């Protein structure tokens, strides 16, 4: 049972880490350098 708990905690922390990194990239300080393709092609 201890092995299953360890794997569950690892997978949960991995998912939380990837989500936190994606939010940081989207809204962090470097987000100003990201281009928006919808703004480039306004009709």
UniProtKB/Swiss-Prot annotation:
Keywords: Chloroplast, Membrane, Plastid, Thylakoid, Transmembrane, Transmembrane helix. Coiled coil: none annotated. It is found in: Plastid, Chloroplast thylakoid membrane. It is a single-pass membrane protein. GO terms for cellular component: chloroplast thylakoid membrane. Belongs to the PsbN family. GO terms for biological process: photosynthesis. This is Protein PsbN. HAMAP family: PSII_PsbN. The gene is psbN. It comes from the Eukaryota. The keyword Membrane applies. May play a role in photosystem I and II biogenesis. The chain crosses the membrane at residues 5-25. Its main location: plastid.
């Amino acid at each position: 049972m201890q092995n299953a708990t360890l794997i569950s905690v690892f997978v949960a922390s991995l998912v939380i880490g990837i989500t936190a990194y994606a939010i940081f990239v989207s809204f962090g300080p470097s987000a100003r350098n990201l281009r928006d393709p919808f703004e480039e092609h306004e009709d």
